[in-house]
Design a protein with these regions (language model features):
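Boundary at the C-terminal end of the N-terminal hydrophobic targeting segment
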Residues: 19-22
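Peripheral terminal and inter-domain segments
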Residues: 324-420
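Surface-exposed interaction/gating patches
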Residues: 48, 134-136, 173-249, 253
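The canonical Cys-X-X-Cys-His
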Residues: 47, 54-64, 113, 148, ...
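Bacterial N-terminal signal peptides
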Residues: 4-17
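C-terminal capping alpha-helices of c-type cytochrome domains
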Residues: 109-123, 136-162, 252-265, 275-302
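Electron-transfer interface patches adjacent to heme c in soluble/periplasmic c-type cytochromes
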Residues: 77-112, 135-145, 222-258, 273-285
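Electrostatic cytochrome c docking/interface patches
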Residues: 26-52, 175-203, 329-339
Length: 420
């Protein structure tokens, strides 16, 4: 869901309103509390595992040695922050999160850190830059959040004064709309539920954020790769992680080995395998298992060779010439079922509308009042593939009457209720 909210922000940035807020950059936020997190050896170790590996904190909040395999943090600079990019009136800075009082997080309370990590609110009340993964970290359990804060307090303090992040005024206004306060308890996956664990890990690590082509002319599909990601002047296209021959079609053990070693295909150092290499076999296996539930996408993506046009994502990237849009074989659907599917469906959280109609015997969908027709191809009488959609759509049919909702079969199912 974090990535869907990011997509909504990107769409808003494409249609920017005139800035008129009295205090741009200040979002809605819950008040700070005086809570503190108890320090225990178990929490410190759990926090280290999360911050160094799953959450990849030091991939952004450190200067990195791009001449070393995997581009690890520069020795002695872990967590000291860095200027990630600077161009014109836009500067993106990952701040110093070491306990240095003068230039880092040493003067921040536990709740300031917790609110920043999970809710995207800086210690001064401003919204953090939307590229910080707090929308993914929002799904961190309360205990894991406490562990991360406790661990960050153990880092050696590093004196490193950095300039602030700067955003153009219009983007600053839009950026402040994204944070959402968290008041209710957040729990983690139940012990022993490996599928729930895999979803938790994928969500918190925001794997779909990089491995889905959110901004491409055509979305190849969830985890279908082709997203251009970068750090400074370095650019790479993310890999297809679905269980297709063009993606992660190899065995579980091979996936785990690749993630530990960084050796597989054309793995690029922008992909933070240096962090993921420290994940346990159990966690990597849980991730692999859940990726097997994602609809397979035919999309070859590489980072070696000349960029070529790709029909699947509409971009140019290495191996792009090997890609053609592949449509599934439609199954027969009874007429009385088809007649119950047309209607208007809406998900308020994402301001997402799907209009479904019948036309010349076909089921056609349009999103958000647009003019692009998407033919829905039946995978079953109630489950449909749409070219360019993030995931298949499942219609909910009662015993009689029209369908009541559509469920987009993403990692976290997104429900669109019938409104007409």
């Amino acid at each position: 869901m974090a990535t869907r909210l990011l997509l909504l922000l990107l769409l808003n940035l494409a249609h920017l309103p005139v800035a008129g807020a009295a205090e741009p950059g200040y979002p809605r936020a819950r008040p700070l509390t005086d809570r503190t997190f108890e320090v225990t050896p178990a929490r410190v170790e759990r926090g280290r595992y999360l911050a160094e590996h799953l959450l990849q904190c030091f991939v952004c909040h450190s200067e990195r040695d791009w001449n070393a395999p995997g581009a690890p943090p520069v020795a002695g600079r872990k967590g000291a922050g860095t200027v990630m990019s600077e161009r014109g009136d836009r500067r993106i800075v990952a701040p110093n999160i070491t306990p240095d009082v003068a230039t880092g997080a040493g003067g921040w309370t536990d709740d300031m850190l917790a609110r920043a990590i999970r809710e995207g609110i800086g210690h001064d009340g401003r919204a953090l830059y939307w590229g910080m993964w707090y929308r993914a970290f929002a799904q961190l359990s309360d205990e894991d959040l406490a562990a991360v804060v406790v661990y960050l307090r153990t880092l050696p303090p590093v004196r490193n004064a950095l300039p602030p992040t700067l955003l153009p005024p219009e983007e600053l206004v839009e950026n402040a709309k994204l944070p959402r306060p968290i008041a209710a308890p957040v729990t983690g996956p139940a012990p022993g539920d490996t599928k729930a664990l895999g979803r938790y890990l994928l969500n918190v690590a925001d794997c779909a954020g990089c491995h889905t082509a959110w901004e491409a002319p055509r979305n190849a599909g969830l985890f279908g790769g082709g997203n251009e990601v970068g750090r400074g002047t370095r650019r790479a296209y993310s890999a297809n992680l679905t269980r297709h021959e063009s993606g992660v079609a190899y065995p579980r053990e091979t996936f785990i080995s690749v993630m530990h070693s960084g050796k597989g295909g054309s793995l690029h150092p922008i992909m933070p395998w240096i962090a993921f290499s420290g994940l346990t076999d159990a966690d990597l296996g849980a991730i692999y298992d859940v990726l097997g539930d994602v609809y397979p996408v035919a999309h070859y993506v590489g980072n070696v060779g000349e960029p070529r046009h790709c029909d699947v994502c509409g971009q140019e990237h290495p191996l792009g010439e090997y890609n053609k849009v592949q449509l599934p074989q439609s199954v027969a659907v009874p007429e009385d079922v088809l007649a119950r599917l047309p209607g208007k469906y809406f998900a308020a959280e994402f301001d997402w509308t799907i209009d479904v109609r019948r036309e010349e015997g076909k089921l056609i969908a349009r999103q958000n009042g647009g003019e692009t027709d998407i033919e829905l191809i039946a995978l079953s009488p109630t489950r449909y593939f749409g070219s360019g959609l993030l995931a298949p759509l499942e219609f909910t049919l009662p015993a009689s009457g029209a369908a009541t909702r559509i469920v987009s079969q993403e990692l976290d199912r997104v429900v669109l209720e019938r409104v007409r």
